[in-house]
């Protein structure tokens, strides 16, 4: 790596390695070298220098993702280093910048997006600051600055991916809606919400600048029904939205909603009309919503072909599958999740027609708990064989034997771009007659030694085919989710409170009956 760094970057590293000297020398450093000083200080985790560099930033723009990405002076990509020490220093430096004399302020735009949360931090301290923590830090800093007596001046436009829960809701609202002049004006290209009430969600999204929002994730413990979704889309409006994720049961009817005698669903049709107004929408995730027979109504009006579609556990029927196989979206799909449906046994012709239509674009396919058994493997191989762009195949929770998996792996070696396979624990490793789909307890009770032997055999299949580039794994309880990991304590408390409320309501109902 040393031979790939430029002399300019080596010099920057040498300077930031001496924090006191670096801070004292900043005023004499050429403006075009500040980006190198920033990356060098971030790489070496010299938080004092990072703060000082931001405080005196001489350029009109600061774009974190671009600065940490590969460059001619330093090819290493640091965008997966969400180092707590460096990010805290960065935001403190941003505050220092707006607090200094107006004549010294140059910064107009601070783009804090473009970094990735990963499971293992490569920074020296090994301590990450996740998306929720970054949101909290920025919101608190904005609130503190709002209380400062500042000279008038143009505010710095801050772009940030926000993650809002009950725990940081108040601070975020204050940051987005300052009572007076605000030196930092937060804009939000991406927004994730969890553990909020529907009214809180509606309120904070109205403040977050929905007209510029590109990605909206409403997940887990935001209890929405179809009435809330319709209200959200109709009243707030997201003209530039490209990606939308809705939580479990988001398309369930409201408690007082009465369906029409002819079986039509005006509420769903209204939601579909609102979605059709989003001319840039290409990603839609509505997993764990009951959408039996409703996919044509929901997806039919969309004006733009979808590239990402998650319909896991949506209780799809033949009407839905037939629509998917023949709709305009099929030929554009890059990411598709149809987990929780017995596709091969119930809808073989439409499912494989869908795969054929998507074969030129499909990169990631997830078929977890789809009832795929040994007798289906031949058909599955035929269906996947045209998918030459497939990079990831995930099919956990299917009752397949070691023999069937070996056959499937042999065929998958023919897919030139495949890089990742998530395969189920072979049914040979479970007691005979084990039921599928499995709960978490049953799933975890298997013969580990036998699994290790079979997994080694499967890796040998790849090795013989010269496909060491394919990574294989069996993540029984799902892949790493940095957002859930970061907020697990708050989510647990939220669930306990919800359970307590449900028990109190049940007890109250029993007393009324008595």
From Swiss-Prot:
Gene3D superfamilies: Ribonuclease Inhibitor (3.80.10.10). It comes from the Eukaryota. Belongs to the PRAME family. LRRC14 subfamily. The keyword Repeat applies. It comes from Homo sapiens (Human). The gene is LRRC14B. The keyword Manganese does not apply. LRR repeats lie at residues 104-141, 185-209, 238-277, 278-302, 303-334, 335-350, 359-386, 387-411. This is Leucine-rich repeat-containing protein 14B. Keywords: Leucine-rich repeat, Repeat.
């Amino acid at each position: 790596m040393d031979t790939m760094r430029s002399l300019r970057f080596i010099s920057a590293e040498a300077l930031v390695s001496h924090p006191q000297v670096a801070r004292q020398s900043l005023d004499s450093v050429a403006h075009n070298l500040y980006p190198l000083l920033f990356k060098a200080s971030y790489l070496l985790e010299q938080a004092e220098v990072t703060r000082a560099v931001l405080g005196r930033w001489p350029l009109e723009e600061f774009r974190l993702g671009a600065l940490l990405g590969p460059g001619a002076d330093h090819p290493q990509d640091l965008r997966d280093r969400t180092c707590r020490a460096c990010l805290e220093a960065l935001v403190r430096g941003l505050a220092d910048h707006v607090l200094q004399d107006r004549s010294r302020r140059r910064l107009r735009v601070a783009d804090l997006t473009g970094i990735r949360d990963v499971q293992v931090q490569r920074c020296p301290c090994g301590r990450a600051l996740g998306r929720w923590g970054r949101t909290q830090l920025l919101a608190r800093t904005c609130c503190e600055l709002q209380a400062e007596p500042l000279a008038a001046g143009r505010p710095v436009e801050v772009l940030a991916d926000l993650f809002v829960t009950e725990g940081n809701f108040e601070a975020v609202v204050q940051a987005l809606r300052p009572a007076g002049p605000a030196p930092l004006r937060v804009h939000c290209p991406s927004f994730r919400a969890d553990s909020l009430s529907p009214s809180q969600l509606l309120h904070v999204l109205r403040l977050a600048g929905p007209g510029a929002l590109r990605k909206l994730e409403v997940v887990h413990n935001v209890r929405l029904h179809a009435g809330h979704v319709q209200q959200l889309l109709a009243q707030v409006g997201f003209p530039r939205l490209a990606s939308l994720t809705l939580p479990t049961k988001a398309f369930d009817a409201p408690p007082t909603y009465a369906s029409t005698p002819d079986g039509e669903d005006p509420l769903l049709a209204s939601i579909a009309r609102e979605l059709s107004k989003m001319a840039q929408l290409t990603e839609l995730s509505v997993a764990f919503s009951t959408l039996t027979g409703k996919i044509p109504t929901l997806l039919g009006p969309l004006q733009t072909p979808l590239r990402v579609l998650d319909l896991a556990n949506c209780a799809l029927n033949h009407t839905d599958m037939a629509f998917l196989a023949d709709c305009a979206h099929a030929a554009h799909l890059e990411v598709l999740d149809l987990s929780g449906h017995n596709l091969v046994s119930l809808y073989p012709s439409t499912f494989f027609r869908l795969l054929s239509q998507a074969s030129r674009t499909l990169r990631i396919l997830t078929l977890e708990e789809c009832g795929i058994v040994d007798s289906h493997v031949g058909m599955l191989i035929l269906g996947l064989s045209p998918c030459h762009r497939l990079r990831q195949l995930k099919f956990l929770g299917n009752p397949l034997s070691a023999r069937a998996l070996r056959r499937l792996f042999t065929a998958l070696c023919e897919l030139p771009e495949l890089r990742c396979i998530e395969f189920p624990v072979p049914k040979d490793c479970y007691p005979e007659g084990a039921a599928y789909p499995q709960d978490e307890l049953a799933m975890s009770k298997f013969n580990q030694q036998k699994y290790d032997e079979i997994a080694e055999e499967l890796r040998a299949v790849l090795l013989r085919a010269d496909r060491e580039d394919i990574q294989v794994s069996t993540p029984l309880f799902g892949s790493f989710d940095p957002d859930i990991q970061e907020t697990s304590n708050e989510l647990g408390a939220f669930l306990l409170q919800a359970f307590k409320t449900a028990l109190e309501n049940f007890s109250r109902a029993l007393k009324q009956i008595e």
